[in-house]
């Protein structure tokens, strides 16, 4: 586990910061199911730990987001994901404003959670909020209803936010998944025994961001 300071060295970000390229004047939209009730304080503690200035953070709820239940493992998992997403978006682009969009339904395999997420994204785009949308989530295409039979309507019907982003020149990113060339089945734990794609990273209007495995020497270099 590396610190944000180590990431800045490993990915040669410090020369960008010296040139004034920090994300200042731009807004990063982060979309997560449920969000985290402690995100503002968590981010502040993170910034104090690493010597960063607090960014402008705006939390927006879309739909009837339920109260946080610390005994709900799904909510706890999303709170952890939210914290990771927000803290490291800020660490890499310290000058950018961050908008956290919280949605009311958990995104899992298949279409669950996606309609609410896409509606939130379109709402923000239509209001001119966000230069970049980052989506650290995804579901295997094969878990969408009808996909294996050549019926892609359940997936295609969710693309409206991305078409809107294209029209408004908003960059949309998505993680490619956690398991290399495969991904989870509908049970969210068993992996497909053959190569599959994760959506929305597979969408042609989305930039897919693949995972990396970082190894540093004692000087912080790769």
Kindly give the residue locations of the regions a language model identified.
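Substrate-binding/charge-relay-adjacent region of secreted/lumenal peptidase catalytic domains
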Residues: 1-211
């Amino acid at each position: 586990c590396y610190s944000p300071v180590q990431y800045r060295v490993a990915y040669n970000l410090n020369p960008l910061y010296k040139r004034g390229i920090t994300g200042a004047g731009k807004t990063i939209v982060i979309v997560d199911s449920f969000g985290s009730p402690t995100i503002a304080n968590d981010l502040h503690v993170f910034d104090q730990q690493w010597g960063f200035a607090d960014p402008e953070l705006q939390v927006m709820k879309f739909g009837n987001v339920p109260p946080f239940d610390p005994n709900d493992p799904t909510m706890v998992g999303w709170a952890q994901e939210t914290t990771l997403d927000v803290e490291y978006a800020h660490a890499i682009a310290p000058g950018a404003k961050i908008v956290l969009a919280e949605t009311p339904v958990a995104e899992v395999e298949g279409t669950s959670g996606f309609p609410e997420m896409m509606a939130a994204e379109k709402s923000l785009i239509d209001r001119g909020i966000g230069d970049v949308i980052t989506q650290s989530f995804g579901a295997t295409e094969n878990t969408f209803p009808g996909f294996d039979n050549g019926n892609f309507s359940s997936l295609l019907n969710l693309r409206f936010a991305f078409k809107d982003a294209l029209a408004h020149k908003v960059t949309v990113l998505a993680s490619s998944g956690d398991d290399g060339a495969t991904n989870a089945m509908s049970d969210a734990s068993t992996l497909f025994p053959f190569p599959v794609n994760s959506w929305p990273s597979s969408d042609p209007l989305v930039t897919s961001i693949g995972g990396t495995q970082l190894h540093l020497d004692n000087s912080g270099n790769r």
